[in-house]
């Protein structure tokens, strides 16, 4: 039986193989955020000459990539990326994802939107029939937090303003936004809910990646890494 950390390491390794096999040398790679993405960064580090550069989805990933010596490019300088590799907090049978547990949802969505192919890497615990057990992160403009929270409550969620782990201060994103975590949703139509939440004034982005879903899933299970396409 593998531990969750071992499963994450296995999918990170599989993603390295997937990228090196399918991406022509000299291309630019999109890189996600989180503990699984960190393992992926470490796995591709010895192969960085394969890439002209990378586009990163958070300051944390940028720091890690630069420590390894990667050339991190501004997303504005890139028109398209062949691949974007990132983790997820939940993924449903259609490849719709719920992301943002690490707070990087907005930049993740921006980089994912540039990519021709989204490679989702996660351990088996992230695969669900219906998303919503993991609280849905919504990045907001701070001055709107109370009114956005009221609107999200109307959708049936229990809303919490994210705080820094182990502290009482409000968690601030790389974009100087705040995050509302919405618990208790049963997300049967993620494409519709993603659009609906985006319509609330003060919302910057929400953690549903349904309109731009995964193209390839590499999932770590008891039998090893399983590859699925959507
Ligand atoms: C960060 C994310 C991550 O991809 C998601 O939280 C999964 O993280 P981990 O790989 O640590 O389980 O969306 O904003």
Give the residues covered by each predicted segment.
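Conserved phosphate- and dinucleotide-binding cores of soluble alpha/beta proteins
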Residues: 2-10, 20-21, 59-230
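Generic hydrophobic alpha-helical segments
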Residues: 11-19, 40
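Short helix-loop-beta connector
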Residues: 19-27
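Short active-site oxyanion
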Residues: 26-29, 47-54, 96
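Glycine-rich beta-strand-to-loop/alpha-helix junction loops that act as flexible
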Residues: 28-36
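Small/polar loops that bind or transfer phosphate-bearing groups
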Residues: 32-33, 53-57, 140
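N-terminal active-site wall of soluble small-molecule enzyme domains
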Residues: 35-44
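Active-site catalytic pocket residues across diverse enzymes, especially alpha/beta-hydrolases
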Residues: 44-48, 69
